[in-house]
């Protein structure tokens, strides 16, 4: 496909505008959503500096507490979830939030048997984001629980989800992964959803974790991948013990790992299970995380799966409907010592600015998290020590992770959600009833191939010790600063509003599809590359929009590539979202 160029003749307006304004540039319809400063006072660190993030969960009306159903039997699933998602379910231009919820694990158990009873009714929750202008301070977030109207009921013991428009009707649909039967929910477009699992042929009763919608065959519709974990039966719950001989949670090595699933979208509302013929089902693994991307530079979307305690999988897309596991050859199956690790969550980004995507994986305490630098041609190298990311991670068990440029300086940073999986004796001896809590972490990319931990200046929420699992990212208040949602096990949600990016320039692109590659050329000739994606992290869905931090620069050129098609915009305005039209010359679209 040819390349199409378009020049912007638009001047950025310094005034705050809420909503969208239609314009035309070379016949291409775009909308500009101008930046607005988030309302509210700035939280400060102990040194008096403005904290990088502020917890705004309560003031924004985002009240949710996870229930894991624990009754003292140490059932393995109860400490593994939850994830959740950030996506625009109603198409109004802002991000809504979806929460996965637990339940009692054994039939016949009652809520009064739970060690941590819950006051709210059980079930997944959907919160609608009603942004409102609060002049002159900017835009305020206000969330409304619309779960009942949405129709979600009996959604199982929740783990994670995937969000994507599988039928091309313009509305985002959901695939919910569970300990137990997974569910496919179609978005009707009127604020409600319907369970169409049987009709789509995507049911799976095994223990699934992370999932993703991805167009593996480049036919314009979204296919579906689900990572499966291990075989666990509550009726055959094995007993495991801590070093003190006290009861403790078992690890995945006590169980048989599963194979993953891949379904091809037929384009008629149904899916074909191609797990076996694609090659995906050839290898077992205790899958916890999955991320899609072109990891060998051949233009096709591949799948990388983080396995817990076993070699990871890098499924390279051959382009003929089959995949080959290239993890061992590529250097991403094991760590630098040749050992498998307890891989949980994962992130991909061009962390070193050399034009290709590197990989970062979270692991169990005492293993260290792992940074795989992309050497090109499908080869990777473990650079965890050299990036200074290994040592600070040793005390923690990490799950969700996000490559987020939290200060908009153009370098992708790392936010990490932590929480133990074995009883912490230091907490247990103090009488802690759920001694798995750990603080989360924030790392700033120095731009020289290394990172520095900046957790101490990240804000009060990063000083808390909780059992964090899922982590999702997105610009919730349209200020160009990407925010965080942290999903805690047996605890409250944390909405962490980004305050660190204020004053830095940025360029946002909305209307992107998962897999789109974005390139921005700055005025100093620096090239910034990003990939639109919703997957990665752990059991979570993030915003598909792309925000590119520019620091103090402006943009000379914006290029978007999709399935070999390419469009280029000259002199794009900054500090705005450019909303791509549904049909752009040069870019393939969904039917």
State the predicted function of each range.
Residues 122-130, 258-265, 316, 373, ...:
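Beta-propeller blade signature
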């Amino acid at each position: 496909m040819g390349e199409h160029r378009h020049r912007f003749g638009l001047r950025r307006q310094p005034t705050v505008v809420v909503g969208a304004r239609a314009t035309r540039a070379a016949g291409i319809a775009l909308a500009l959503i101008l930046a607005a400063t988030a309302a509210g006072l700035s939280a400060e660190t102990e040194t008096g500096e403005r904290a990088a993030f502020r917890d705004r969960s309560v003031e924004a009306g985002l009240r949710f507490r996870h229930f894991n159903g624990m009754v003292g039997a140490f059932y393995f699933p109860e400490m593994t979830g939850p994830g959740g998602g950030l996506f625009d379910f109603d198409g109004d231009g802002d991000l809504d939030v979806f929460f996965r919820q637990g339940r009692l694990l054994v039939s016949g158990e009652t809520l009064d048997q739970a060690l941590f009873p819950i006051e709210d009714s059980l079930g997944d929750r959907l919160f609608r984001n009603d942004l409102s202008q609060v002049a002159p301070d900017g835009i305020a977030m206000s969330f409304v629980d619309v779960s009942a109207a949405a129709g979600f009921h009996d959604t199982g013991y929740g783990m994670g989800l995937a969000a994507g428009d599988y039928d091309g009707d313009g509305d985002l649909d959901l695939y919910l992964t569970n300990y137990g039967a997974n569910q496919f929910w179609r978005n009707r477009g009127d604020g409600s959803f319907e369970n169409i699992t049987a009709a789509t042929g995507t049911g799976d009763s095994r223990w699934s974790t992370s999932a993703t919608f991805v167009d593996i065959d480049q036919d314009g519709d979204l296919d579906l991948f689900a990572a499966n974990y291990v075989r666990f039966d509550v009726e055959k719950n094995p007993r495991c013990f801590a070093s003190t001989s006290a009861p403790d949670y078992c690890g995945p090595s006590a169980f048989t790992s599963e194979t993953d699933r891949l379904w091809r979208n037929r384009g008629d509302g149904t899916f074909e299970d191609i797990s076996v013929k694609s090659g995906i089902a050839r290898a077992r693994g205790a899958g916890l995380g999955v991320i899609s991307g072109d990891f060998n530079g051949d233009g096709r979307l591949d799948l990388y799966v983080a396995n817990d305690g076993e070699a990871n999988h890098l499924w390279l897309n051959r382009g003929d409907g089959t995949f080959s596991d290239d993890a061992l050859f590529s250097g991403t199956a094991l760590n630098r010592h040749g050992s498998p690790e307890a891989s949980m969550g994962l992130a991909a980004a061009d962390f070193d600015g050399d034009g290709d995507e590197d990989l970062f994986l979270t692991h169990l305490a005492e293993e260290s998290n792992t940074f795989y630098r992309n050497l090109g041609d499908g080869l990777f190298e473990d650079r965890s020590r050299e990036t200074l990311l290994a040592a600070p991670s040793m005390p923690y068990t990490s799950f969700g992770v996000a490559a987020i440029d939290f200060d908009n300086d153009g370098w992708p940073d790392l936010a990490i959600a932590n929480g133990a999986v074995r009883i912490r004796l230091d907490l247990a001896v103090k009488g802690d009833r759920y001694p798995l809590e750990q603080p989360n972490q924030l790392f700033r990319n120095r731009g020289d191939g290394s990172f520095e931990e900046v957790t101490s200046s990240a804000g009060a929420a990063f000083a808390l010790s909780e059992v964090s699992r899922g982590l999702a990212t997105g610009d919730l208040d349209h200020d160009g600063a990407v925010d965080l949602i942290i999903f805690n096990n047996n605890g409250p949600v944390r909405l962490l509003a980004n305050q660190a990016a204020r004053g830095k320039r940025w360029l946002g692109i909305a209307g992107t599809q998962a897999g789109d590659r974005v390139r921005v050329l700055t005025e100093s000739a620096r090239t910034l590359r990003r990939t639109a994606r919703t997957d990665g992290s752990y059991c979570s869905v993030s915003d598909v929009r792309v925000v590119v931090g520019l620091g103090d620069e402006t943009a000379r050129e914006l290029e978007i590539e999709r399935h070999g098609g390419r469009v280029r915009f000259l002199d794009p305005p900054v500090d705005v979202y450019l909303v791509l039209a549904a049909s752009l010359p040069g870019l393939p679209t969904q039917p």
